[in-house]
């Protein structure tokens, strides 16, 4: 695999990537996940996004670089994972996914895990 794009900041390490993809997989089963850059943008605009995951190997990376700006405006944490193929698998689809949004649901059993993950991502953004 090639070097990740330097514009992809903050990039999750291997352990954090695994945790993120686990949460993404669980969120998929609970219908708390939106896949793709367009749907991620919609969740941000509607204010229902908990955090945004983007693939660092998106080609060209510029197709999702509007998301970090929007995330900062809306105060939503965001993170890059190394592989769009792995993100696609975690999302439960057979195609690569370059961006995903975990959405909020107060009654969800994922709530505690989502809060912990948001804290970890926010620490990387400092």
UniProtKB/Swiss-Prot annotation:
<comment type="function">
    <text>Common component of the spliceosome and rRNA processing machinery. In association with the spliceosomal U4/U6.U5 tri-snRNP particle, required for splicing of pre-mRNA. In association with box C/D snoRNPs, required for processing of pre-ribosomal RNA (rRNA) and site-specific 2'-O-methylation of substrate RNAs. Essential for the accumulation and stability of U4 snRNA, U6 snRNA, and box C/D snoRNAs.</text>
</comment>
<comment type="subunit">
    <text>Component of the U3 snoRNP particle. Binds to the C'/D and B/C motifs in U3 snoRNA. Component of the 25S U4/U6.U5 tri-snRNP particle, a subcomplex of the spliceosome. Binds to the 5' stem-loop of U4 snRNA.</text>
</comment>
<keyword id="KW-0539">Nucleus</keyword>
<dbReference type="InterPro" id="IPR018492">
    <property type="entry name" value="Ribosomal_eL8/Nhp2"/>
</dbReference>
<keyword id="KW-0687">Ribonucleoprotein</keyword>
<dbReference type="GO" id="GO:0071011">
    <property type="term" value="C:precatalytic spliceosome"/>
</dbReference>
<dbReference type="GO" id="GO:0000494">
    <property type="term" value="P:box C/D sno(s)RNA 3'-end processing"/>
</dbReference>
<dbReference type="GO" id="GO:0005730">
    <property type="term" value="C:nucleolus"/>
</dbReference>
<dbReference type="GO" id="GO:0030621">
    <property type="term" value="F:U4 snRNA binding"/>
</dbReference>
<keyword id="KW-0507">mRNA processing</keyword>
<dbReference type="GO" id="GO:0000452">
    <property type="term" value="P:snoRNA guided rRNA 2'-O-methylation"/>
</dbReference>
<dbReference type="InterPro" id="IPR004037">
    <property type="entry name" value="Ribosomal_eL8-like_CS"/>
</dbReference>
<dbReference type="GO" id="GO:0000462">
    <property type="term" value="P:maturation of SSU-rRNA from tricistronic rRNA transcript (SSU-rRNA, 5.8S rRNA, LSU-rRNA)"/>
</dbReference>
<dbReference type="GO" id="GO:0031428">
    <property type="term" value="C:box C/D methylation guide snoRNP complex"/>
</dbReference>
<dbReference type="InterPro" id="IPR029064">
    <property type="entry name" value="Ribosomal_eL30-like_sf"/>
</dbReference>
<keyword id="KW-0747">Spliceosome</keyword>
<dbReference type="GO" id="GO:0032040">
    <property type="term" value="C:small-subunit processome"/>
</dbReference>
<dbReference type="GO" id="GO:0000398">
    <property type="term" value="P:mRNA splicing, via spliceosome"/>
</dbReference>
<dbReference type="InterPro" id="IPR004038">
    <property type="entry name" value="Ribosomal_eL8/eL30/eS12/Gad45"/>
</dbReference>
<keyword id="KW-0694">RNA-binding</keyword>
<keyword id="KW-0508">mRNA splicing</keyword>
<dbReference type="GO" id="GO:0034511">
    <property type="term" value="F:U3 snoRNA binding"/>
</dbReference>
<dbReference type="GO" id="GO:0046540">
    <property type="term" value="C:U4/U6 x U5 tri-snRNP complex"/>
</dbReference>
<dbReference type="GO" id="GO:0030490">
    <property type="term" value="P:maturation of SSU-rRNA"/>
</dbReference>
<keyword id="KW-0698">rRNA processing</keyword>
<dbReference type="InterPro" id="IPR050257">
    <property type="entry name" value="eL8/uL1-like"/>
</dbReference>
<dbReference type="Pfam" id="PF01248">
    <property type="entry name" value="Ribosomal_L7Ae"/>
</dbReference>
<keyword id="KW-0690">Ribosome biogenesis</keyword>
<dbReference type="InterPro" id="IPR002415">
    <property type="entry name" value="H/ACA_rnp_Nhp2-like"/>
</dbReference>
<dbReference type="GO" id="GO:0003723">
    <property type="term" value="F:RNA binding"/>
</dbReference>
<comment type="similarity">
    <text>Belongs to the eukaryotic ribosomal protein eL8 family.</text>
</comment>
<protein>
    <recommendedName>
        <fullName>13 kDa ribonucleoprotein-associated protein</fullName>
    </recommendedName>
</protein>
């Amino acid at each position: 695999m090639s070097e990740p794009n330097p514009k992809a900041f903050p990039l999750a390490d291997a352990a954090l990537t695994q945790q993120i993809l686990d949460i993404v997989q669980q969120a998929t089963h609970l219908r708390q996940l939106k896949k793709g850059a367009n749907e991620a943008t919609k969740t941000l605009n509607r204010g229902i996004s908990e955090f945004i995951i983007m693939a660092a190997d998106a080609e060209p990376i510029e197709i999702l670089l509007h998301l970090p700006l929007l995330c900062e405006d809306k105060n939503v944490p965001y993170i890059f994972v190394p592989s769009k193929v792995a993100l696609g698998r975690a999302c439960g689809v057979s195609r690569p996914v370059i961006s995903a949004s975990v959405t909020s649901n107060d009654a969800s059993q994922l709530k505690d895990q989502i809060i912990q993950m948001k804290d970890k991502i926010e620490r990387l953004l400092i």
